Structure formats: structure tokens, C-alpha cells
């Protein structure tokens, strides 16, 4: 267990040092998601998303020392982090105390200090994972928002059977919708496509600011310097991510890798109304960082159908059929309406684009912190008018009781209003 935590800790720290989004999480990919007869949506993810005491069948080593970790707060959507830190302290206390009883959380200026008085080999990695997870959960109509390289939505090209649109919608080969190589792109290509989109400011956007990225040219000295600073090797023939994403240019140009100056990179700006989401990975046993050459991405119009704030009462339960731990939640009154509406629209479109010899079920996508968790389909024949949200949803996967409780806790208290990255 300690080896696993150590590996994850190294990955998180490497991401932090590169100035990248934190706490990569890995879903359990099992192909298309079945919609249960009782109309309960089962969202398959990995319990390995949350690293916590008890997430292995082997008990952790006995606690023998204290661990203190300091985190720096970065504003989200240009809000001053200082004013947002009081609720952050309360949220983190709730998150951490269920996993590490007795943990102390305090603030000093723009920093959050977490101390676990009784620590073992996995404590620091567990704290990193729980604290650096913002837990912003968003639901999208997949085909209505996913873009192909020509900038058009998948939905608008299904009747003409555009090959890339069909691959993104229905999967390709062994790749399920939302997974790597099912119409996905490398990071630079995805961000370039996203940067060419017009601003689409809307009340249903997941963020209210542009997003700034910096890339180095293939084979450039900047890529070599960034790879050296991160303890990796640059990939020949590919653009490298030097920094980002951030919501302002100043943050992007601060904390560049050693040996990289602001003039060394290409800055791409993704306007409000467009998002870049990392694909569902083929394997979740080893987290793939955003700057890994094998990482794949999709570009979507940022029209959120249901927010994480629209879910209610997330709890750790046991699947009645298998006995395995999972996380259940209901929807708020607004969430129920929106879930019915979006699944109805998806079902109607599936009926429209299908033909007697070809069924093209359509999908919704669930993203957690800009990473796709799953892209399940709606069976338009079984649910022609969508799915009633009264029965809520069930997140099932490779959970232990402890890790299922962790996810329920994180969802219960909502996303952090700031991004927290480890200091030092």
C-alpha cells in the first residue's frame, strides 16, 4: 500500500511542480454504461479516485509521526482567494476528518496548513489527493456539445455520417465514447481547436473567464528545459505543455519551469464557453498526467446541463445486487427537471439520427474537474421521453467502503472555491 501511495504522491507532486491541474483521477472503463430498468443511472468510476486510509485490503502501517502540508490558494474565475479561504477551511475539515480523524486545518494569508498528528506512510499522499481535488462535477449533453476538428458539433454531423463525428458519438474499434482514440485529440491539438472558438458567454458555463495555456515547440530548448525540470524526457515531434491552464495571463507566466522564460512559449487562450476535457483513460491503475504524450482530450461547448450543486444527499451505500460499496445521490428539484429534460433531448435525437438498420443511441457526459468520468448512452427505445430523476443516480466502481465514503463526503460539501496546490 505504501508503494502505491508513494507512487501517487510522486505523480501529484510532479504535476504541481509543472503548474498543472492536480490530483489526476482514473475511471474504471467498462464500455457503454447500462441504464437500469428502474431508471437509476449507474455512473462507473474508480474508487481509486480518492486515496484514503482503508482503500487497500491490507491495513496501513501504524501511525508513528505527524505530517504537515502547506497549500497555496489560487483564485478561480478571478475571485480573490483570501475572501474565499474561510469556507475552504470548513470544507477541508469535513473532508479530511472522515479519513484522518484529528487532522488540523488552518489558514495563514493565502495558504492552507494541514497537520495530521498521527501519520503513516500513506498519510501525506492521501492529504494531497483529498485537498487538491476541487470536486467540480458537471453533466453535459455529449453529442450536442462535443466538437470535431472542423469546429462543428458531433450532433450536427451524424445524419451525414461524418466519420469523426460517428467515432466520437459511437466509439471507434475498442474505444468507447469519451475514451482515448474514439475521436480524441492530443492536448496541443485540442487546445488549439478550443482557442479558435468564438466566446460563448452563458449562464450555463462551468467557468466565467478565458483559460490560458503555454506550449513549447517540438524539439525546442524550452521543451527540453521543462522536461528536465519535471524529471522526464521530452517527446520528439510533439508540442510540450510548459504551463497552464490558468484563468489569467499573469498566473500563467508565474512559476514557469526552470530554464523557461515567457518568450519561449506559445500562449493559447481558450475563450469562455469552450472546455477541454481529458478523455476517459483506458487504465486507471497509474494516473496519466495532463502533459503526458499519451493523454487524449476532447473539446466541448461549455453548456452544462446539470451541476454538482444540483445533486442531493450523496451517501456511501452497498449495491443490493453485488454487495459492493458505491455512492448514491438524489437530485434537487431543479436537478430532477434538468435531468429529465436533458435525457429527453438526448433520446429524441437518438431516434432522429437512427435508421431501421442503424441504432445511434446518444449520450450524456459526466466530468469531474475537467476529466471525463463516463459517457453513458440513453436507450431512446426504452426511454423515449427521457429518464425521471426521482430515483437519483448511483456511482459504482472499484470502491472500498472508505473510498466510497470519501467521494460522498467530497460531493456533499461541494467544490472548493479556489485551487489548492502543495507548497514546496
Give the predicted meaning of each segment.
Residues 3, 7, 11, 48-424:
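A structural signal for conserved, well-ordered secondary-structure elements
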Residues 1-3, 17-61:
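Membrane-interface helical sensory segment of bacterial ECF anti-sigma factor regulators
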Amino acid at each position: 500500500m505504501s508503494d502505491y501511495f508513494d507512487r501517487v504522491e510522486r505523480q501529484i507532486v510532479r504535476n504541481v511542480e509543472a503548474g498543472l491541474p492536480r490530483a489526476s483521477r482514473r475511471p474504471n472503463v467498462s464500455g457503454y454504461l447500462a441504464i437500469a430498468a428502474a431508471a437509476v443511472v449507474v455512473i462507473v468510476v474508480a474508487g481509486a479516485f480518492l486515496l484514503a486510509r482503508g482503500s487497500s485490503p491490507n491495513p496501513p502501517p501504524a501511525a508513528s509521526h505527524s505530517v504537515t502540508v502547506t497549500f497555496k490558494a489560487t483564485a478561480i474565475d478571478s475571485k480573490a482567494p483570501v475572501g474565499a479561504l474561510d469556507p475552504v477551511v470548513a470544507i477541508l475539515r469535513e473532508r479530511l476528518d472522515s479519513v484522518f480523524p484529528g487532522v488540523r486545518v488552518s489558514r495563514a494569508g493565502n495558504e492552507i496548513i494541514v497537520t495530521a498528528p498521527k501519520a503513516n506512510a500513506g498519510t501525506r499522499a492521501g492529504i494531497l489527493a483529498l485537498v487538491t481535488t476541487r470536486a467540480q462535477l458537471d453533466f453535459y449533453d455529449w453529442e450536442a456539445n462535443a466538437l470535431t476538428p472542423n469546429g462543428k458539433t458531433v450532433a450536427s454531423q451524424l445524419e451525414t455520417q461524418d466519420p469523426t463525428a460517428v467515432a466520437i458519438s459511437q466509439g471507434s474499434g475498442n474505444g468507447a465514447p469519451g475514451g482515448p482514440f474514439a475521436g480524441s485529440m492530443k492536448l496541443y491539438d485540442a487546445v488549439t481547436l478550443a482557442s479558435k472558438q468564438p466566446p460563448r458567454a452563458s449562464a450555463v458555463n462551468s467557468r466565467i473567464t478565458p483559460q490560458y495555456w503555454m506550449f513549447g515547440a517540438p524539439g525546442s530548448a524550452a521543451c527540453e528545459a521543462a522536461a528536465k525540470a519535471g524529471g522526464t524526457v521530452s517527446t520528439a515531434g510533439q508540442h510540450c505543455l510548459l504551463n497552464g491552464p490558468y484563468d489569467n495571463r499573469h498566473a500563467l507566466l508565474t512559476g514557469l519551469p526552470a530554464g523557461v522564460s515567457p518568450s519561449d512559449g506559445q500562449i493559447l487562450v481558450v475563450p469562455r464557453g469552450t472546455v477541454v476535457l481529458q478523455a476517459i483513460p483506458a487504465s486507471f491503475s497509474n494516473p496519466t498526467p495532463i502533459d503526458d504524450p499519451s493523454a487524449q482530450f476532447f473539446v466541448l461547448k461549455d453548456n452544462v446541463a446539470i451541476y454538482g450543486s444540483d445533486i442531493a444527499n450523496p451517501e456511501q451505500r452497498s449495491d443490493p445486487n453485488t454487495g459492493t460499496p458505491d455512492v448514491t445521490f438524489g437530485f434537487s428539484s431543479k436537478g430532477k427537471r434538468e435531468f429529465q429534460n436533458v435525457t429527453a433531448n438526448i433520446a429524441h435525437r437518438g431516434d432522429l439520427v437512427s435508421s431501421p438498420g442503424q441504432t445511434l443511441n446518444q449520450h450524456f457526459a459526466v466530468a469531474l474537474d475537467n476529466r471525463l468520468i463516463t459517457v453513458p448512452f440513453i436507450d431512446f427505445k426504452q426511454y423515449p421521453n427521457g429518464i425521471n430523476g426521482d430515483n437519483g443516480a448511483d456511482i459504482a466502481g472499484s470502491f472500498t467502503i472508505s473510498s466510497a465514503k470519501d467521494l460522498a463526503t467530497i460531493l456533499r460539501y461541494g467544490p472548493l472555491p479556489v485551487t489548492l496546490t502543495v507548497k514546496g
